[in-house]
A protein has these predicted regions:
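N-terminal targeting sequences that direct proteins away from the cytosol to non-cytosolic compartments
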Residues: 5-59, 67, 130-132, 139-162
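A short, sequence-level motif marking secondary-structure junctions
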Residues: 48, 74-79, 126-130
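Signature of long, low-cysteine stretches enriched in small and polar/charged residues
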Residues: 87-133, 139
């Protein structure tokens, strides 16, 4: 009996030492988030701004005699940072009007700043669909405001997502 005990004791001690096979299931694989596709911007630009002066993957610049129009798409996230990028001012120092249109939040604001040739006026709109900030900025000299024949209200009202 003692011999049997001493023979079974090492087997019992080594019984829990077997290597286990690691199993993986589909639930163990992390799923990477996919970015939503960018939507198209629709805007009715003045006739003299029909052709962009500069173009990149994220936007277009239209330079005209008395004003500039900048249309760009930025990644959504920090709205305050987008406002600061467009205007140079913090959101707290501007009056930002928020409305909702076409499944996106719309933010409109204006500002004045010193430019190379005097005071410049700026107006911007941001459409935030949760994935991207679609923006349009118009910059013009304060002196040229009286001379500009463009009806800016129509341009800004036409800015939308398709």
């Amino acid at each position: 009996m003692k011999k049997l005990f001493w023979m079974l004791l090492p087997l019992l001690l080594l019984a829990g030492c077997a290597a286990r096979e690691t199993m993986e299931t589909l639930g163990d694989i992390p799923v990477e988030g996919t970015a939503a596709p960018q939507r198209q911007i629709s805007v009715k630009l003045p006739d003299e701004a029909a052709v962009p002066t500069a173009e990149s993957d994220s936007g277009r610049i239209y330079l005209c005699k008395d004003y500039e129009i900048i249309i760009q798409t930025l990644e959504a996230g920090d709205l305050d940072e987008t406002i600061r990028t467009l205007s140079g001012y913090d959101r707290d120092s501007l009056t930002v009007m928020k409305t909702r249109a076409e499944g996106a939040d719309r933010y409109d604001f204006v500002w004045a700043a010193a430019g190379e040739n005097g005071e410049r006026l700026g107006r911007a709109v941001i459409l935030d669909d949760g994935n991207y900030h679609y923006t349009m900025t118009v910059l013009k000299d304060a002196e040229a405001t009286k001379k500009t024949q463009v009806v800016w209200r129509t341009v800004f009202e036409s800015f939308s997502l398709v």
